[in-house]
Amino acid sequence: QFTNVSCTTSKECWSVCEKLYNTSRGKCMNKKCRCYS
């Protein structure tokens, strides 16, 4: 799943993904957070 959350490191996305998609797996791609379920 793609998000509109900007990021610089994948670590920033973990809590975002947990909130949005209830998954703790996320990566920073092209300066945006991307979540995996």
Swiss-Prot record:
Site (Basic residue of the functional dyad): K27
Protein localization: Secreted
Disulfide bridge partners, by residue number: C7-C28, C13-C33, C17-C35
Highest taxon of the lineage: Eukaryota
In-chain residues carrying the UniProt-annotated modification Pyrrolidone carboxylic acid: Q1
Any Pfam family matching the protein: Toxin_2
Region feature Interaction with Ca(2+)-activated K(+) channels, mapped onto this chain: 26-33
Protein family membership: Belongs to the short scorpion toxin superfamily. Potassium channel inhibitor family. Alpha-KTx 01 subfamily.
Function: Potent selective inhibitor of high conductance (maxi-K), different medium and small conductance calcium-activated potassium channels (KCa1.1/KCNMA1 and others), as well as a voltage-dependent potassium channel (Kv1.3/KCNA3>Kv1.2/KCNA2>Kv1.6/KCNA3>>Shaker/Sh). It blocks channel activity by a simple bimolecular inhibition process. Has a pH-specific antimicrobial activity against bacteria (B.subtilis, E.coli and S.aureus) and the fungus C.albicans.
Domain notes: Has the structural arrangement of an alpha-helix connected to a beta-sheet by disulfide bonds (CSalpha/beta).
Protein name: Potassium channel toxin alpha-KTx 1.13
